[in-house]
UniProtKB/Swiss-Prot annotation:
The modification O-di-AMP-tyrosine is found at residue 113. The active site is at 106, 111. This is Probable ribonuclease HepT. Its EC number is 3.1.-.-. Modified by cognate antitoxin MntA; probably at least 2 successive AMPylation events occur on Tyr-113. InterPro entries: HepT. It comes from Haemophilus influenzae (strain ATCC 51907 / DSM 11121 / KW20 / Rd). SUPFAM superfamilies: Nucleotidyltransferase substrate binding subunit/domain (SSF81593). A motif (RX(4)HXY motif) lies at residues 106-113. Probable toxic component of a type VII toxin-antitoxin (TA) system, probably an RNase. Neutralized by cognate antitoxin MntA. Neutralization is probably due to AMPylation by MntA. A mixture of HepT and MntA binds nucleotides; the highest affinity is for TTP, ATP binds more tightly than ADP or AMP.
């Protein structure tokens, strides 16, 4: 079992940036006044930030599991769903199926660009913010500096 604390600064900053982007886009009066190219760029930026926060979340989830594990070699060999199962068991996440769905969302946007698919992914970012906020709070609690 390791005792080093995780540095959550990058995840904190990325999460905050995504959250603020979604808040700005949610201001319908402001958003509707923007030219369509700006609207598209803002949505694309939010999706890219989602992808980044998602990837960072998984990395931090895995690192925390390595911190908590008795045998860290086991965690290193785990596949994606194994990581999620352990994260659920350790209380880092609340709903494994949502994290599987987020991976599917990330795969959709990273392999092709289709406006309809992009909007479907964007529509799920609010839910992702709730789930990733839960993860971030669990990570903060486990990595408090005295």
């Amino acid at each position: 079992m390791m005792t080093d604390k995780l540095n959550l600064n990058v995840l904190d900053a990325a999460f905050y940036s995504l959250e603020q982007t979604v808040v700005q886009i949610s201001d319908r009066n402001w958003f509707d006044m923007q030219p369509s190219i700006v609207q598209d760029t803002l949505i694309a930026g939010a999706i890219q930030k989602f992808e980044f926060v998602y990837e960072l979340s998984l990395k931090m989830m895995k690192r925390q599991l390595q911190q908590d594990a008795i045998n860290t070699d086991d965690i290193g060999a785990y596949g994606f769903k194994d990581i999620l199962r352990e994260a659920l068991r350790f209380g880092l996440i609340g709903d494994m199926s949502k994290w599987v769905a987020y991976r599917d969302m990330r795969n959709i946007t990273s392999h092709t660009y289709d406006q309809e698919k992009a909007m479907a992914v964007y529509a799920q970012i609010d839910d992702f913010l709730i789930e990733s906020s839960f993860l971030l709070e669990q990570l903060r609690q486990r990595n408090q500096y005295d």
